[in-house]
Amino acid sequence: MAQQTPLYEQHTLCGARMVDFHGWMMPLHYGSQIDEHHAVRTDAGMFDVSHMTIVDLRGSRTREFLRYLLANDVAKLTKSGKALYSGMLNASGGVIDDLIVYYFTEDLFRLVVNSATREKDLSWITQHAEPFGIEITVRDDLSMIAVQGPNAQAKAATLFNDAQRQAVEGMKPFFGVQAGDLFIATTGYTGEAGYEIALPNEKAADFWRALVEAGVKPCGLGARDTLRLEAGMNLYGQEMDETISPLAANMGWTIAWEPADRDFIGREALEVQREHGTEKLVGLVMTEKGVLRNELPVRFTDAQGNQHEGIITSGTFSPTLGYSIALARVPEGIGETAIVQIRNREMPVKVTKPVFVRNGKAVA
């Protein structure tokens, strides 16, 4: 039996089509995925992300532990509330999960991890935390709502009290603050400004209804996927998994190589991969009729005349741009064009950076 978030009843009241998503009943859409997508790009939309796992870590050696656990370096986190995106790697350099870590105090940090990887993440974290004496608290008492779009912060702020409005005033991206019952973070998965708000389960439904009344459109998993793909954001299990290096998933920027003497899980394997080269993640654009889909082969000939093949990891029709886009993992040496096999047709595609839309505007 699939689990339900505290907002399940609100989704059904809003007319959602519910689907099983990694063991959770979640809204796919509320009538029109396209309308929901455009609401986030032009105004304000919201997503129930309560299926994600919030984990609080306490102990005097928490920073030391996270410097070992994660490929990015929490030594960068010096201001309370600052957040960092990182891969959590296995010994062979594969990605166990990608996550966000928040620094509150020297003995309190918070992780937000994916729902699909919850059990293995908690097992891995618990196993490696033991020698550091870390107290691990899974915050199943909290729900989370992502409010995203150019007007999202202003509309959400109408629900805040004076102290909460003051707490978030001027807050830069990738920060979080606890203000009363709300943990408000300037993070998201859409390429738009907004907040991700964690709050007690029993208060989630009232907060959701108030956001609807404030003019924020409920959005489902369908729009969440097209928005994140336009923004060039990875989805665990597609762009990366335990067999794929972060270097092959456009996550090289999240690896803190310096200081060179910091030992983190997977470092040795990554250094070998960096030296010998890996595949890389690129963007693909197809303006001709048709849709680029996951797992389609991508073929190209390099400058030396050698033929290579890669694979589309995520593909869709872009509602913002009006044509098909994809992320693809390909060998090094790809040029500005490639061929994608769609059924029995060879379709030309343009190779771009793996990001297509930011703040409502085309990047590619």
Curated annotation (Swiss-Prot):
Residue ranges the record marks as coiled coil: none
Keyword tags: Aminotransferase, Transferase
Catalysed reactions, semicolon-separated: N(6)-[(R)-S(8)-aminomethyldihydrolipoyl]-L-lysyl-[protein] + (6S)-5,6,7,8-tetrahydrofolate = N(6)-[(R)-dihydrolipoyl]-L-lysyl-[protein] + (6R)-5,10-methylene-5,6,7,8-tetrahydrofolate + NH4(+)
GO annotation terms (biological process): glycine decarboxylation via glycine cleavage system
Signal peptide positions (record): none
GO MF assignments: aminomethyltransferase activity; transaminase activity
GO cellular component, one term: glycine cleavage complex
EC number per UniProt: 2.1.2.10
Protein task: The glycine cleavage system catalyzes the degradation of glycine.
Protein family (similarity comment): Belongs to the GcvT family.
Matches recorded under PANTHER family: AMINOMETHYLTRANSFERASE (PTHR43757), AMINOMETHYLTRANSFERASE, MITOCHONDRIAL (PTHR43757:SF2)
Subunit composition and interactions: The glycine cleavage system is composed of four proteins: P, T, L and H.
Name the UniProt record assigns to this protein: Aminomethyltransferase
Phylogenetic lineage: Bacteria, Pseudomonadati, Pseudomonadota, Gammaproteobacteria, Enterobacterales
Gene that produces this protein: gcvT
